[in-house]
Amino acid sequence: MNAGGLASNGRQFKNPDEMWREEVGDQSKKSEWYNKGVSYWQGVEATVDGVLGGYGHVNDADIKASEAFLNALLAERFTNAGRGHHLVALDCGSGVGRVTKNLLIRYFNEVDLLEPVSHFLEAARGNLAPENLLVSDSYKAANFYCLPLQDFTPDAQRYDCIWIQWCIGHLADDDFVSFFKRAKGGLKPGGFFVLKENIARAGFVLDEEDKSVTRSDSYFKELFNQCGLHIWKMKDQKGFPDELFAVKMYALTTEIPKIVNPSKTRRQSKNRPGVIK
Protein backbone atom coordinates (compact mmCIF):
# COMPACT_ATOMS: atom_id res chain seq x y z
CA MET A 1 0.00 0.00 0.00
CA ASN A 2 1.77 3.11 -1.24
CA ALA A 3 -0.80 5.79 -0.39
CA GLY A 4 0.25 8.42 2.10
CA GLY A 5 -1.33 9.17 5.43
CA LEU A 6 -1.81 11.81 8.06
CA ALA A 7 -1.41 11.86 11.84
CA SER A 8 -3.74 13.70 14.19
CA ASN A 9 -0.85 16.02 15.11
CA GLY A 10 -0.50 17.10 11.45
CA ARG A 11 2.46 14.87 10.62
CA GLN A 12 2.36 13.50 7.05
CA PHE A 13 3.66 10.09 5.99
CA LYS A 14 4.60 8.93 2.51
CA ASN A 15 3.21 5.44 3.10
CA PRO A 16 2.21 3.04 5.90
CA ASP A 17 5.70 1.54 6.12
CA GLU A 18 7.14 4.91 7.09
CA MET A 19 4.49 5.38 9.78
CA TRP A 20 4.83 1.87 11.21
CA ARG A 21 8.65 2.13 11.33
CA GLU A 22 8.30 5.28 13.39
CA GLU A 23 5.56 3.97 15.67
CA VAL A 24 6.44 0.28 16.18
CA GLY A 25 9.89 -0.03 14.59
CA ASP A 26 11.30 -2.20 17.39
CA GLN A 27 9.86 -4.33 20.17
CA SER A 28 10.15 -1.54 22.72
CA LYS A 29 8.19 0.85 20.50
CA LYS A 30 5.59 -1.81 19.73
CA SER A 31 5.03 -2.52 23.43
CA GLU A 32 4.68 1.21 24.06
CA TRP A 33 2.15 1.49 21.21
CA TYR A 34 -0.09 -1.22 22.66
CA ASN A 35 0.31 -0.05 26.26
CA LYS A 36 -0.71 3.49 25.33
CA GLY A 37 -3.77 2.21 23.49
CA VAL A 38 -4.99 0.23 26.49
CA SER A 39 -4.11 3.08 28.87
CA TYR A 40 -6.28 5.47 26.87
CA TRP A 41 -9.33 3.23 27.23
CA GLN A 42 -8.60 2.57 30.89
CA GLY A 43 -9.40 6.24 31.42
CA VAL A 44 -12.82 5.97 29.77
CA GLU A 45 -15.98 5.24 31.77
CA ALA A 46 -17.51 1.80 31.27
CA THR A 47 -20.74 2.92 29.61
CA VAL A 48 -22.13 2.75 26.08
CA ASP A 49 -21.54 6.49 25.71
CA GLY A 50 -17.99 6.05 26.96
CA VAL A 51 -16.98 3.26 24.60
CA LEU A 52 -18.61 5.13 21.70
CA GLY A 53 -16.59 8.26 22.38
CA GLY A 54 -19.55 10.37 23.44
CA TYR A 55 -21.67 9.21 20.50
CA GLY A 56 -23.89 6.80 22.39
CA HIS A 57 -26.84 8.07 20.34
CA VAL A 58 -25.53 6.21 17.25
CA ASN A 59 -26.07 2.86 18.99
CA ASP A 60 -29.53 2.26 17.55
CA ALA A 61 -28.52 3.00 13.95
CA ASP A 62 -25.41 0.88 14.36
CA ILE A 63 -27.28 -2.15 15.71
CA LYS A 64 -30.07 -1.85 13.13
CA ALA A 65 -27.60 -1.92 10.22
CA SER A 66 -25.53 -4.69 11.79
CA GLU A 67 -28.63 -6.82 12.36
CA ALA A 68 -29.72 -6.51 8.72
CA PHE A 69 -26.21 -7.45 7.60
CA LEU A 70 -26.06 -10.42 10.00
CA ASN A 71 -29.50 -11.69 9.01
CA ALA A 72 -28.50 -11.75 5.35
CA LEU A 73 -25.30 -13.63 6.20
CA LEU A 74 -27.05 -16.25 8.32
CA ALA A 75 -29.57 -16.85 5.53
CA GLU A 76 -26.81 -17.26 2.96
CA ARG A 77 -24.38 -19.29 5.04
CA PHE A 78 -26.58 -21.68 7.05
CA THR A 79 -29.59 -23.86 6.34
CA ASN A 80 -32.78 -22.36 7.76
CA ALA A 81 -30.76 -19.20 8.54
CA GLY A 82 -29.07 -21.04 11.42
CA ARG A 83 -32.27 -21.88 13.28
CA GLY A 84 -31.94 -25.32 14.83
CA HIS A 85 -28.14 -25.01 14.92
CA HIS A 86 -26.13 -24.37 18.09
CA LEU A 87 -24.38 -21.19 16.99
CA VAL A 88 -21.38 -19.64 18.74
CA ALA A 89 -19.89 -16.16 18.24
CA LEU A 90 -16.82 -14.27 19.41
CA ASP A 91 -17.17 -10.53 20.09
CA CYS A 92 -13.72 -8.95 19.64
CA GLY A 93 -13.04 -5.65 21.36
CA SER A 94 -16.33 -6.24 23.13
CA GLY A 95 -16.07 -3.28 25.48
CA VAL A 96 -19.03 -3.26 27.88
CA GLY A 97 -20.88 -5.92 25.88
CA ARG A 98 -22.88 -3.46 23.77
CA VAL A 99 -22.86 -5.49 20.52
CA THR A 100 -23.32 -8.79 22.34
CA LYS A 101 -26.30 -7.59 24.39
CA ASN A 102 -28.07 -5.70 21.60
CA LEU A 103 -27.37 -8.11 18.76
CA LEU A 104 -25.22 -11.23 18.99
CA ILE A 105 -26.84 -12.89 21.99
CA ARG A 106 -30.20 -12.85 20.19
CA TYR A 107 -28.80 -14.99 17.35
CA PHE A 108 -26.02 -17.06 18.92
CA ASN A 109 -26.50 -19.60 21.69
CA GLU A 110 -23.10 -18.77 23.12
CA VAL A 111 -21.09 -15.57 22.82
CA ASP A 112 -17.52 -15.24 24.04
CA LEU A 113 -16.21 -11.73 24.75
CA LEU A 114 -12.63 -10.62 24.13
CA GLU A 115 -11.58 -7.28 25.64
CA PRO A 116 -8.20 -6.03 26.99
CA VAL A 117 -9.62 -3.32 29.29
CA SER A 118 -10.54 -5.00 32.56
CA HIS A 119 -13.17 -2.54 33.84
CA PHE A 120 -14.99 -2.73 30.50
CA LEU A 121 -15.08 -6.51 30.75
CA GLU A 122 -16.36 -6.41 34.32
CA ALA A 123 -19.13 -4.06 33.21
CA ALA A 124 -19.94 -6.51 30.41
CA ARG A 125 -20.29 -9.34 32.95
CA GLY A 126 -22.92 -7.33 34.76
CA ASN A 127 -24.69 -6.16 31.62
CA LEU A 128 -24.87 -9.74 30.34
CA ALA A 129 -25.91 -11.43 33.57
CA PRO A 130 -28.98 -13.63 32.94
CA GLU A 131 -31.26 -11.36 34.96
CA ASN A 132 -30.34 -8.43 32.66
CA LEU A 133 -31.07 -10.23 29.38
CA LEU A 134 -34.34 -10.49 27.49
CA VAL A 135 -33.50 -13.84 25.90
CA SER A 136 -34.19 -17.47 26.77
CA ASP A 137 -31.82 -19.56 28.86
CA SER A 138 -30.48 -21.20 25.69
CA TYR A 139 -28.64 -17.95 24.83
CA LYS A 140 -25.80 -16.80 27.06
CA ALA A 141 -22.49 -15.00 27.38
CA ALA A 142 -20.16 -17.94 27.88
CA ASN A 143 -16.56 -16.79 28.33
CA PHE A 144 -14.93 -13.46 29.14
CA TYR A 145 -11.31 -13.14 27.98
CA CYS A 146 -9.29 -10.16 29.23
CA LEU A 147 -6.73 -10.17 26.43
CA PRO A 148 -5.75 -7.97 23.47
CA LEU A 149 -6.33 -9.25 19.95
CA GLN A 150 -2.62 -9.69 19.25
CA ASP A 151 -2.30 -12.16 22.15
CA PHE A 152 -5.45 -14.20 21.54
CA THR A 153 -5.69 -17.60 19.87
CA PRO A 154 -9.21 -19.09 19.64
CA ASP A 155 -10.08 -22.72 20.30
CA ALA A 156 -10.11 -24.72 17.08
CA GLN A 157 -13.40 -24.62 15.14
CA ARG A 158 -15.41 -23.08 17.99
CA TYR A 159 -17.04 -20.13 16.22
CA ASP A 160 -19.68 -19.67 13.55
CA CYS A 161 -19.04 -15.92 13.57
CA ILE A 162 -16.13 -13.80 14.76
CA TRP A 163 -17.36 -10.20 15.06
CA ILE A 164 -14.68 -7.47 15.13
CA GLN A 165 -15.93 -3.91 15.51
CA TRP A 166 -14.08 -0.66 16.16
CA CYS A 167 -10.95 -2.27 17.55
CA ILE A 168 -8.79 -3.60 14.68
CA GLY A 169 -7.30 -0.13 14.20
CA HIS A 170 -5.20 -0.71 17.31
CA LEU A 171 -3.28 -3.52 15.58
CA ALA A 172 -0.13 -2.90 13.56
CA ASP A 173 -0.29 -4.44 10.09
CA ASP A 174 1.83 -7.49 10.96
CA ASP A 175 -0.31 -8.23 14.02
CA PHE A 176 -3.49 -7.65 11.99
CA VAL A 177 -2.43 -10.38 9.55
CA SER A 178 -1.21 -12.71 12.31
CA PHE A 179 -4.47 -12.32 14.23
CA PHE A 180 -6.66 -13.24 11.28
CA LYS A 181 -4.46 -16.17 10.32
CA ARG A 182 -4.80 -17.56 13.86
CA ALA A 183 -8.48 -16.72 14.07
CA LYS A 184 -9.25 -18.61 10.85
CA GLY A 185 -8.52 -21.78 12.81
CA GLY A 186 -11.27 -20.82 15.25
CA LEU A 187 -14.01 -20.86 12.60
CA LYS A 188 -16.32 -23.81 12.14
CA PRO A 189 -16.96 -25.00 8.57
CA GLY A 190 -19.15 -22.33 7.01
CA GLY A 191 -18.10 -19.79 9.64
CA PHE A 192 -17.29 -16.18 8.82
CA PHE A 193 -15.80 -12.95 10.11
CA VAL A 194 -17.61 -9.63 10.28
CA LEU A 195 -15.30 -6.62 10.41
CA LYS A 196 -17.05 -3.31 11.01
CA GLU A 197 -14.73 -0.34 10.96
CA ASN A 198 -14.18 3.33 10.31
CA ILE A 199 -12.88 4.00 6.80
CA ALA A 200 -10.45 6.73 5.74
CA ARG A 201 -11.16 8.41 2.41
CA ALA A 202 -7.65 7.55 1.23
CA GLY A 203 -4.49 6.09 2.73
CA PHE A 204 -4.76 6.17 6.52
CA VAL A 205 -5.19 8.44 9.53
CA LEU A 206 -3.10 7.91 12.67
CA ASP A 207 -4.71 8.89 15.97
CA GLU A 208 -1.85 9.82 18.29
CA GLU A 209 -4.09 9.98 21.36
CA ASP A 210 -5.42 6.41 21.45
CA LYS A 211 -2.75 4.84 19.19
CA SER A 212 -5.00 3.58 16.44
CA VAL A 213 -5.06 3.76 12.65
CA THR A 214 -8.09 4.34 10.46
CA ARG A 215 -7.43 2.58 7.15
CA SER A 216 -8.94 3.15 3.72
CA ASP A 217 -11.04 0.54 1.93
CA SER A 218 -8.14 -0.28 -0.42
CA TYR A 219 -5.76 -0.60 2.55
CA PHE A 220 -8.12 -3.10 4.21
CA LYS A 221 -8.49 -5.09 1.01
CA GLU A 222 -4.74 -5.42 0.67
CA LEU A 223 -4.52 -6.74 4.23
CA PHE A 224 -7.42 -9.16 3.65
CA ASN A 225 -5.48 -10.58 0.72
CA GLN A 226 -2.41 -11.08 2.93
CA CYS A 227 -4.63 -12.89 5.45
CA GLY A 228 -5.97 -15.27 2.80
CA LEU A 229 -9.51 -13.95 3.29
CA HIS A 230 -12.19 -13.15 0.73
CA ILE A 231 -14.98 -10.59 0.85
CA TRP A 232 -18.29 -12.45 0.84
CA LYS A 233 -20.36 -9.30 1.28
CA MET A 234 -19.82 -5.66 2.18
CA LYS A 235 -22.11 -2.76 3.02
CA ASP A 236 -21.85 0.88 4.07
CA GLN A 237 -23.28 2.00 7.39
CA LYS A 238 -25.96 4.68 7.00
CA GLY A 239 -27.45 7.21 9.39
CA PHE A 240 -24.34 8.35 11.28
CA PRO A 241 -23.51 12.04 11.89
CA ASP A 242 -21.60 13.69 9.03
CA GLU A 243 -18.60 14.56 11.20
CA LEU A 244 -17.78 10.89 11.81
CA PHE A 245 -15.69 8.67 9.58
CA ALA A 246 -17.54 6.56 7.05
CA VAL A 247 -18.11 3.01 8.34
CA LYS A 248 -18.13 -0.23 6.35
CA MET A 249 -19.15 -3.78 7.19
CA TYR A 250 -17.15 -6.61 5.61
CA ALA A 251 -18.16 -10.27 5.75
CA LEU A 252 -14.98 -12.30 5.26
CA THR A 253 -14.62 -15.99 4.48
CA THR A 254 -11.79 -18.41 3.94
CA GLU A 255 -13.35 -19.70 0.72
CA ILE A 256 -13.76 -17.77 -2.51
CA PRO A 257 -17.39 -16.65 -3.04
CA LYS A 258 -19.14 -18.34 -5.94
CA ILE A 259 -19.44 -16.20 -9.05
CA VAL A 260 -22.89 -15.78 -10.56
CA ASN A 261 -23.12 -16.96 -14.19
CA PRO A 262 -22.34 -13.73 -16.12
CA SER A 263 -24.47 -14.64 -19.14
CA LYS A 264 -27.46 -15.24 -16.86
CA THR A 265 -26.85 -11.90 -15.19
CA ARG A 266 -26.77 -10.11 -18.53
CA ARG A 267 -30.03 -11.69 -19.66
CA GLN A 268 -31.76 -10.73 -16.43
CA SER A 269 -30.48 -7.15 -16.53
CA LYS A 270 -32.37 -6.48 -19.78
CA ASN A 271 -35.63 -6.95 -17.90
CA ARG A 272 -34.81 -4.40 -15.21
CA PRO A 273 -35.74 -0.70 -15.24
CA GLY A 274 -32.80 1.57 -16.00
CA VAL A 275 -32.63 2.79 -12.86
CA ILE A 276 -14.58 11.67 10.88
CA LYS A 277 -13.89 11.49 14.01
Please tell me what each predicted stretch does.
Residues 163:
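A conserved beta-strand element that flanks and buttresses the S-adenosyl-L-methionine
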Residues 167:
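Hydrophobic adenine-recognition pocket in adenosine-nucleotide-binding enzymes
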Residues 1-157, 171-182, 189-277:
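Class I (Rossmann-like) S-adenosyl-L-methionine-dependent methyltransferase catalytic domain
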